[in-house]
Amino acid sequence: MLTGWKEPIVLDKDADIVNMKPLADDGDTYIIYNDGYKDEFYMLENRQKQGNEAGLYASGLMITHVDYSQEAWEANDVNTTRERYAIMAADNSKARTIPDVEGDLYPFNGNNSFGNTTIPAATLNHANTDGSKLLNKEITDITKNADGTISFKFRNNNTTGISEINAESSKPAIYNMNGIMMGYDLDKLPKGIYLWKGKKVKK
């Protein structure tokens, strides 16, 4: 993701996702926001060993934590001071050897859930609406189907602030021509050519 070519689907209400297609088959990406800080979110993608992703070491649901900062992205300092873009490995290993990478995607060895109390857990860098640094949303019953699709259940356990944040987070992100996310307000960006709502926009 973060390429600007396809807008992710926001998960903010309880939902059962069935037969989510692989990214290589133009499948959807889902996004779950920190309700207290819209630039922090989790992305869900179905990554399968097929097409232009045939060389992957694993297949399944990839959960990525993003703590977006325009300054960090522009300076290429995304993961220097802290992790702003990281895969939440199903085996809870940050090692990059092949055996460890093979355990990155869900489900893996019985781990088919992601939430406040799972390992790894859905933690945050910025406070949520309740003051905690927990997402308060969970993904359960992650299943990899025989045809390469993924199914899972999403539950929103937040009780405050949801409607207000949804209005903000529904704004489409803006990207530069290198696929770097620049923010949400075109008026605040310098002159140039951007990708917005899937189209090139000149400011």
Could you tell me what each predicted segment is?
Residues I9-T159:
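Non-catalytic C-terminal accessory/binding modules of secreted extracellular proteins
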Residues M1-T3:
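Extended catalytic-interface subdomain
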Residues T159-K203:
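C-terminal outer-membrane/trafficking sorting elements
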